């Protein structure tokens, strides 16, 4: 039971808190009103049935003491002896409760890491199957209090699956691959950081949502992590995580015996290689006795692996598994294996087939402490994919699902995208193996195929930024991941409401507003990025951030759309295409094979159709594209006004931080909308029935203005500039001026200016009306926003600034002065003069 419903009406009108950085996340333990009667109804003592400081039970006692004080102003003493339930919280394991208190008969049956929480007036029992479970129960109790829930309860809960891990793609130099929240909290300059204070804070957050394992380094691993001095550093990290019930594991580079060990081979059948890995494993466990195990990316995207020596992927995984077996360690072996040099000229080639092609023949050949870690979809964390068919093809192999909290393809934390509704499309999908219920969530738990291991992994990539992920709102995804890994049937809306109450307080207006924004965010992003199963139409060859649909095709990466002037989509049918649909069990395969039974939202994933193909909605494919992109961008505009309605209810620091990102998202969603619509309008030659695409009556194109020191510039990709053209200063030392006489009716408008904010310079612009300064700004988004910057004029650097409520008279003279800096030539795309209520 995680839900917390405030029982005091006054809690819905709590005022603004002091400024907050976000460092505490959902563990901020904000004060909840608790008068004298409330205070007297709370326990006065905390009994921890383990006094060892490295014990999660001891930590539970400290968390309870701190939480009671911060949330309710209650000072509770902590002791490790006694079993009196009078005005006490007793926290410990089932075994300790039975031994020390001569009790425990009433404790329900618990699975590994499960706990029982019993609240009876001033008597609280928190009993875990393990010490980790006891800590989880303590966090559960505190979560209830922090949400104003003082209910008397008695219930037991156990995890959905034994493996609930997070992955960090941290590099030894301190950078983080696909990380948008600052540098690594673990590594710097090739070694483990001396200051690991952020690690302890991260451990608290993870434990509070019941995460029990972490891989601390990038799957594209650097063998230098295995040097003795770095092993010592890993031990320091593990010592910090241990009291929070979190076991540390590491990613391995398959070729380490050669690159680090100076062996002539890394063949997994070679005795010297086997011995080398055995010695490394022994050294690690000597330092970290409870190490979780290894994560391995092999024979994928240039990473070395066993197939170099004509060994199977199972051969490679089992080599590590046997080294770990004496210590109880686990190998998480990624199923993300594919050839990124395949030819699109072959109609039957399909990257989506790779996982099943590689792993299905190996089912039953992996050792029992190997878990195959499978991305939720067949390609790569796209805005919508079908469930990976590999889940339905490994009956005799342990599996785990791989999700992504970091928004690599989904806005990189510069766009609000609440991900659980996307994840639930996969977790709740019934693969119908052998015509029996086979939900993905029941397969990864081990339940469906009676497997001993299984579970969850999520790529998180927190960094040293005080918001952890680069955005306050993005933390809802980390919170929700932990919640779902424990209980995947939870409702996405209920989860985000709990997170909102814990993060922003109990004000009903805040809860309702942020719930609406969050639940609308993924559909909006899908609408303005890529829909109908076409994938996220981002630049797959560069940043994975802004729009560039052409980048999907014409290369070996296999994220093809096969779009031409007549048709679009991948034919993945057995009858005519790549035969991918046939990788599913019969009932699902039949659904996807037939265009009539394929859901519209996956039509272009499974079928190659004309732009004029009618959907079940009655719209053509191309008109759906146009409409969806306009709808998505319009929704993104509403996020700003919704958030602004909370101005007086949220501390200024977090309010402004979020507002900056939502304003940016509103502008960038229009960049996305126009780029995708212009691209397919140009490609298909089919007009928008509503005459919006290519028609912008409120715009003034920069290249049509009177230019002095500015020159026109043909932007590439062409669709990422209005009318395909921008302006740049004639040189990096030249100030540019663009002027125009405005031919709009006299009135009050929002004045928007679309420009490009490139990495490598911080240009400065000033906008004037009749020589009166309207506003000025600097191109410094690389210092403000989290997404990967670009050195080009493109869909990544394109953005908008808006000056609101500007009084304009017909015939006013608009002037923009741009001063270049570094490599950035003060680029401008267009000006838009928007009447109230109009979305450009």
Swiss-Prot record:
It catalyses: an alpha-D-glucuronoside + H2O = D-glucuronate + an alcohol. One of its GO terms (cellular component) is extracellular region. GO terms for biological process: xylan catabolic process. It comes from the Eukaryota. InterPro entries: A-glucoronidase_C_sf (IPR037054), Glyco_hydro_67_aGlcAse (IPR011395), Glyco_hydro_67_aGlcAse_N (IPR005154), Glyco_hydro_67_C (IPR011099), Glyco_hydro_67_cat (IPR011100), Glycoside_hydrolase_SF (IPR017853), Hex-like_dom2 (IPR029018). CDD domains: CBM6-CBM35-CBM36_like. Glycans are attached at residues 50, 149, 222, 262, 279, 310, 465, 527, 576, 610, 682, 723, 732. Residues 1-19 form the signal peptide. It is an enzyme of class 3 (hydrolase). It is found in: Secreted. Its main location: secreted. Keywords: Carbohydrate metabolism, Glycoprotein, Glycosidase, Hydrolase, Polysaccharide degradation, Secreted, Signal, Xylan degradation. Its EC number is 3.2.1.139. GO terms for molecular function: alpha-glucuronidase activity. Belongs to the glycosyl hydrolase 67 family. Alpha-glucuronidase involved in the hydrolysis of xylan, a major structural heterogeneous polysaccharide found in plant biomass representing the second most abundant polysaccharide in the biosphere, after cellulose. Releases 4-O-methylglucuronic acid from xylan. This is Probable alpha-glucuronidase A. The lineage of its organism: Eukaryota, Fungi, Dikarya, Ascomycota, Pezizomycotina.
């Amino acid at each position: 039971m995680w839900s917390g419903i405030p029982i005091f009406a006054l809690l819905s009108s709590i005022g603004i808190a002091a400024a907050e950085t976000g460092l505490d996340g959902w563990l901020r333990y904000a004060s909840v009103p608790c008068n004298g009667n409330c205070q007297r109804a709370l326990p006065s003592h905390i009994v921890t049935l383990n006094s060892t400081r490295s014990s999660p039970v001891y930590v539970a006692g400290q968390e309870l003491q701190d939480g009671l004080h911060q949330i309710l102003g209650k000072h509770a003493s902590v002791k490790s002896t006694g079993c009196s339930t009078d005005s006490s919280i007793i926290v410990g394991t089932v075994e300790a409760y039975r031994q020390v208190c001569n009790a425990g008969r009433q404790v329900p049956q618990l699975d590994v890491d499960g706990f029982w929480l019993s609240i009876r007036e001033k008597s609280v029992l928190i009993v875990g199957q393990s010490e980790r479970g006891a800590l989880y129960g303590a966090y559960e109790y505190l979560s209830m209090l922090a949400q104003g829930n003082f209910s008397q309860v008695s219930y037991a809960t156990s995890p959905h699956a034994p493996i609930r891990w997070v992955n960090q793609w941290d590099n030894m130099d301190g950078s983080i691959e696909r990380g948008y929240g600052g540098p690594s909290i673990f590594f710097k300059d090739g070694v483990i950081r001396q200051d690991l204070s952020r690690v302890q804070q991260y451990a608290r957050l993870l434990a509070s949502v019941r995460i029990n394992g972490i891989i601390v380094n990038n799957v594209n691993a650097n063998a230098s992590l295995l040097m003795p001095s770095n092993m010592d550093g890993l031990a320091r990290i593990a010592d910090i995580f241990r009291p929070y019930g979190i076991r540390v594991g590491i990613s391995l580079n398959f070729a380490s015996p050669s690159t680090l060990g100076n062996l002539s081979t890394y063949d997994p059948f070679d005795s010297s290689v086997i011995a080398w890995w055995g010695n490394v494993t022994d050294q690690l466990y000597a330092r970290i006795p409870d190490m979780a195990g290894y994560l391995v990316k092999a024979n994928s995207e240039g990473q070395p692996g066993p197939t170099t020596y004509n060994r199977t992927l199972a051969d490679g995984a089992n080599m590590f598994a046997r080294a770990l077996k004496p210590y109880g360690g686990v190998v998480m072996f990624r199923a993300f294996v594919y050839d990124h040099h395949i030819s699109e000229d072959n109609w039957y080639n399909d990257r989506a087939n790779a996982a099943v092609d590689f792993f299905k023949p190996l089912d039953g050949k992996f050792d029992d402490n190997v878990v195959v870690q499978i991305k939720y979809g067949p390609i790569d964390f796209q805005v919508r994919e079908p469930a990976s068919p590999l889940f339905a093809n490994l009956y005799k192999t342990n599996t785990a699902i791989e999700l992504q909290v970091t928004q690599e393809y989904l806005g990189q934390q510069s766009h609000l995208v609440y991900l659980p509704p996307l994840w639930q499309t996969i977790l709740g999908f019934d693969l119908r193996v052998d015509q029996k219920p086979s939900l993905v969530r029941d397969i990864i738990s081990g339940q469906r195929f009676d497997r001993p291991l299984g579970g969850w992994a999520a790529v998180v990539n927190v960094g040293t930024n005080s918001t952890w992920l680069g955005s306050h709102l993005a933390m809802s995804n980390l919170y929700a991941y932990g919640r779902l890994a424990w209980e995947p049937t939870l409702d996405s809306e209920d989860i985000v409401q709990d997170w909102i109450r814990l993060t922003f307080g109990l004000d009903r207006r805040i809860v309702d507003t942020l719930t609406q924004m969050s639940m609308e965010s993924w559909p909006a992003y899908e609408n303005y990025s890529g829909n109908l199963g076409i994938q996220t139409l981002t630049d797959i060859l560069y940043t994975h951030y802004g729009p560039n649909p052409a980048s999907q095709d014409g290369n070996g990466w296999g994220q093809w759309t096969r779009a031409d002037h007549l048709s679009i989509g991948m034919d993945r049918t057995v009858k005519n295409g790549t035969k991918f649909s046939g990788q599913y069990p019969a009932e699902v395969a039949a659904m996807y094979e037939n265009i009539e039974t394929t859901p519209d939202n996956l039509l272009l994933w499974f079928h190659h159709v004309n732009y004029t193909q009618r959907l079940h909605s009655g719209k053509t494919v191309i008109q759906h594209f146009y409409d969806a992109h306009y709808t998505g961008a319009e929704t993104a505009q509403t996020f700003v006004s919704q958030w602004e309605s909370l101005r007086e209810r949220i501390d200024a620091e977090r309010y402004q931080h979020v507002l900056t990102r939502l304003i940016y998202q509103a502008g960038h969603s229009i960049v996305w909308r126009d780029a995708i619509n212009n691209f397919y309008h140009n490609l298909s030659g089919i007009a928008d029935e509503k005459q919006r695409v290519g028609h912008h009556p409120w715009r003034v194109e920069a290249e049509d203005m009177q230019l002095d020191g500015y020159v026109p510039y043909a932007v590439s990709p062409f669709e990422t500039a209005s009318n395909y053209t921008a302006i740049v200063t004639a040189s990096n030392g030249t100030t540019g001026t663009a002027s125009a006489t405005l031919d709009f009716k006299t009135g009050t408008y929002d004045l928007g200016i679309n420009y490009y904010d490139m990495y490598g310079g911080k240009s400065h612009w000033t906008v004037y009306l009749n020589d009166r300064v309207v506003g000025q700004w600097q191109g410094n988004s690389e210092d403000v926003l989290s997404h990967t910057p670009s050195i080009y004029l493109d869909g990544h650097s394109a953005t908008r600034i808006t000056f609101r409520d500007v009084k304009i008279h017909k015939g006013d003279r608009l002037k923009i002065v741009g001063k270049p800096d570094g490599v950035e030539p003060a680029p401008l795309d267009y000006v838009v003069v928007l009447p109230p209520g109009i979305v450009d």
